[in-house]
Amino acid sequence: VPDGRLLPADLLARAYRKAAEDAARTNSLSYRDPRGSPDLRRAIADMLRRQRGLMVSPDHICITRGSQMGVFLTARILIRPGDAVLVERLTYEPAVAAFRACGAKIVTVGLDEDGVDVADVERACRKHRVRAIFVTPHHQFPTTVSMRPDRRLRLLEMARQFGLAVIEDDYDHEFHFGA
């Protein structure tokens, strides 16, 4: 047992008391928006509009504690038992686990040096009742290849044509490293 004299108990008690009083005074102990801080969601929506040209509002943003929670929540909303979810041949396995937990049938599609094989995606969409595709097009995980722009556009066309959701894990878009 550590020597109790080493612990600044009075100092800690004062700090805890002040934090609790401040929280009570500012109503910080009440329930918050489950989607996350409104200020943070507003800042992210602004960044996505400015840097990526996406037309989003803070209401389109939900802050999670990590990509796995985000994928799981998305899967719970979109996937019904028996729906097919397309995943790249090599992919983020925890996402596959989230889709399976929702009763999805996992269908693997090809991947090459230019990203997901869109011809393979189209074949799968014609063969299965596909609800979604999970992709990491910027730096594909785990290969790090980037999907060519023409393939990205074709994937969006197929999403409209077949009514499937594109679930993109853009885990490191803002990271850029020198050669």
What are the language-model segments listed below?
Residues 1-18:
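N-terminal basic, amphipathic alpha-helical segments
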Residues 16, 21-163, 173-178:
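Conserved core of the PLP fold type I
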